[in-house]
Amino acid sequence: LVLVYRPEALKRHLAKRAVAKLLIKAGYDPGAGVDACLHRLRHRMEGREFPHEVGLFLGYPPEDVAGFCRYCGQKYKYCGHWKVYGDVDQAKALFEQYDRCRDALCRRVGMGLSIVQIFPVV
């Protein structure tokens, strides 16, 4: 998994009450900062069980991540890029946003740009 993110935006996202609550439940300490959470995620990715909380780092709505864990991937309302347990319209809007981002990235890669050129390190 390669995660491209804006540090301040990810910090704000992980600090949201619903997100932080799920992270704590999964053994994270959101108060320790983004780097500590990413280190924990990396450790969990190397483990035997898939860390479904990765969806929180990818911007999935927390109610969808919680629902997936609670219902073991069943009883969802809608399935797109992920299984939706919360607001279907909100999720569909996010799916469209993700599609636009993916398409823009693919166009740039198709033009011969490298990942470093597309996402310059600041």
Predicted segment positions?
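Generic secondary-structure signature for well-ordered alpha-helical cores
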Residues: 46, 70, 74, 103-110
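Hydrophobic/aromatic-rich, well-ordered segments within soluble, folded domains that form packed cores
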Residues: 50-77
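Short linear loop/turn motifs
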Residues: 36-40, 69-72, 79-86
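Poly-acidic low-complexity segments
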Residues: 6-7, 67, 87
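Surface-exposed beta-strand edges and their flanking turn/coil or helix-capping segments
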Residues: 15-19, 65, 69, 83, ...
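Long, compositionally biased
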Residues: 81-122
